[in-house]
Each structure stands twice: as C-alpha cells, then as structure tokens.
C-alpha cells in the first residue's frame, strides 16, 4: 500500500509541476481514500487547491493536518498563507508566530509574517522581518524583493 501511495504522490507532484492541478487533485483524492490521515497528501492537496484559488478548501486540508499535528510547520505556514490570501492578515500572523515559536529562524515564516504586516499597514515592522530573514539567508529572493518594495513605499510616503 505504501509504495502505491508514494507512487501516486510522485505522479501528483509531477502533475503540479506541469500545471495540471485538477489531475493532481485526483491523485491526492486516491491517496486520501487509501490513507485519509496522510500528512503529505493533505498538505500537498491543500497547496494544489490554493493554486486553483479554492482557498476555503485548502484551509480545510491544513486543518486536517493541524488537528492531529498542531506543530506541523508546513501546515502552519500554508494555513497562514491561505489566510493571507483571504486578507485575514492578523489570523495569518498568528500561524506564523506559532512557527517562529517552534523555529525562530524559519525564513519563510519570517518573510510571510513581514508580508502580512506590510499588508496590515505596519511597513516598518515588515522591514524588520524581511531584514531578519535576510540575515539568515542573504540570497532569499522573496525577502529581498519584499524589503526593497517596503523601503520604496516608505520613501514615497
């Protein structure tokens, strides 16, 4: 059974890389019929649903994981990302804060928290988070682009 689900996960991943998200969802559904509590399948299906802009369904997939693994960093970050997409920046930040309690140097959580802070209007605090992410990985493009954008915004206001 394990080799079948691993094979389906690989197929689904390749389909996602090719932009065939609907076909990938079929693979994830097949996996979840076999292994309903598969962490990887639940998270990856959530990401795929997010790519298709089915945000509330994606959130449900992340909740499935967080119900049994409340400290799953991937599920927490993706939940924050989905909430950010819905404009629920404060809620998103609360998920990033959990990640940062678990891993103070998680550059994705630092950067995403900065993005949510920026969208909430706290540009100076966003800059601090982008800068902290870059102090950990100076080549992290998303943090650098976000930092540059935030600084330009500060100069123009």
Give the role of each language-model region:
Residues 5-6, 39-40, 73-74, 107-108, ...:
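Helix-start (N-cap) detector for alpha-helical repeat units in TPR-like alpha-solenoids
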